Design a protein with these regions (language model features):
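Conserved Rossmann-fold SDR core element
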Residues: 78, 82, 88-100, 140-147
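Catalytic Tyr-X3-Lys loop
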Residues: 5-25, 39, 43, 77
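C-terminal helical subdomain
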Residues: 97, 115-175
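Catalytic loop of short-chain dehydrogenase/reductase
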Residues: 41-76, 81-89, 102
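A short helix-coil junction within the Rossmann-fold of NAD(P)-dependent oxidoreductases
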Residues: 2-3, 29-41, 52
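Conserved catalytic Lys-bearing alpha helix of Rossmann-like short-chain dehydrogenase/reductases
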Residues: 20-23, 69, 73-81, 95, ...
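A short, exposed helix-loop element centered on a Lys and neighboring polar residues
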Residues: 27-28, 82
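Conserved mid-core segment of classical short-chain dehydrogenase/reductases
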Residues: 1-13, 54-62
Length: 175
């Protein structure tokens, strides 16, 4: 993450490739199998960084505009998701995005921002997994949505378990 004026063309292309082109490539390769089965589920991973900040003045928690390009790629992915949902609805293929409500502290994120976050700013990987599992089994009319993981869990009354299937685990760092 860095301000927009510090992104080289190479880094912009890499980020667009990872966050937009690669998911679309995988979707295009998977669609023939979904067409044959006459159903399918596509779940893209988005981010709250796609939202426009309110301002001025802009209170971005001290990060200024460092999420700008990353957020732009996630906004593009969300738009592709709703476009695909409208194109594929009659084929019983659900297409949704899900984003964490708080930061998911993957190993990579932990290395970059882990020391900057409190446990209240962290969502467990297990919570993301539970919301993704719901979207992988949702009804055909549940398509074209940009969901927020913890909201899905609350709306669907889901119980978040740890990755071994034990005691409920909702937020904070994974054990």
């Amino acid at each position: 993450y860095k301000p927009l004026d510090q992104y080289s063309l190479k880094h912009r292309r890499i980020m667009t490739e990872i966050n937009v082109q690669a998911p679309l490539d995988l979707i295009q390769q998977s669609l023939p199998f979904m067409f044959e089965a006459n159903e399918g589920w596509i779940i893209n991973l988005s981010s709250g960084s796609k939202r426009h900040p309110s301002g001025p003045p802009y209170d971005l928690g001290g990060v200024k505009g460092v999420y700008g390009f990353y957020g732009a790629t996630k906004a593009m992915l969300d738009r592709l998701t709703t476009a695909l949902a409208s194109e594929l609805a009659d084929k019983h293929i659900r297409v949704n995005t899900v984003e964490p409500k708080a930061a998911v502290l993957s190993e990579g994120a932990d290395a970059v921002v882990g020391d900057m976050l409190t446990s209240s700013q962290i969502e467990s990987i297990e919570a993301m997994v539970e919301s993704i599992l719901f979207l992988a089994h949702c009804k055909p009319e549940h398509t074209g949505r940009n969901e927020i993981s913890l909201d899905v869990i609350d709306q669907q009354n889901l119980t978040v378990m740890d990755l071994e299937g034990h005691e409920p685990h909702r937020g904070g760092k994974s054990s």
